[in-house]
UniProtKB/Swiss-Prot annotation:
Coiled coil location: none
One cellular-component annotation, GO: host cell nucleus
UniProt-recorded name of the protein: Uracil-DNA glycosylase
A GO biological-process term: base-excision repair, AP site formation via deaminated base removal
KW Hydrolase (keyword) present: yes
Amino acid sequence: MEEWLRKHMWPALPDHQHHPSYDILLAEPWVQFLDMTPFFRQKLYNTLSKINEMRKSCIIYPPQAEIMSWSYLCAPEDVKVVIIGQDPYHGGQANGQAFSVNKGFPVPPSLQNIFKEVRSCYPDFVSPGHGCLEEWGRQGVLLLNTILTVEAKKPGSHSDLGWTWFTNLIISTLSNKLNNCVFMLWGSKAIAKSLMINKQRHLVLKAQHPSPLAAKNNYSSSQCKFLGCGHFLTANKYLTQHNKVPIDWTLE
């Protein structure tokens, strides 16, 4: 794969440069799991350097130190559920984990709907009054945006900055190396990633995006509405059937 990318997609990068994990902000277990060769490290380092330079002239979210925060919540071998988002919140609340915000920020509308759906599956669930999903992450729920940065108040502004190859690598490697994970794909951009997932080894759940806009939209779609999709209950049933500890969706 690397040789094909070198030849067809990217200009040649120097082989002799070696960037340690802290240079590319990625937790070491993920560096090893993704087989981050010097070539891949250089490519990721270049993207991060470009974004860091852009911060001198515009506001970018999340902060540089939080871009890879998703990689520090659980080891790759412990991932059980993958929730794929689009790009980070662009209003200052992004923290490097899809749909999540740090405590102290208002709960975004999409996350409010996610909490509604959890409560639909588990009536005892109580919305925590905050939007921090780190407790899910520590149990093996990977909250991954396909684009890892965004310019303030400009959604989708970093879609062409070089993140797609990296997040595609994460998704495909999880699919290839793990077994019996649940991939939750909400919205057309996330659903497009289903082509990278081995459906013989994993459960793929699809629905419309949890945003209120998608919920109100009456356009024709082959995907079920997010509210009422039952994904959180279905995921735990699947994990239990495959001798994995189900996710406790409770948030304190």
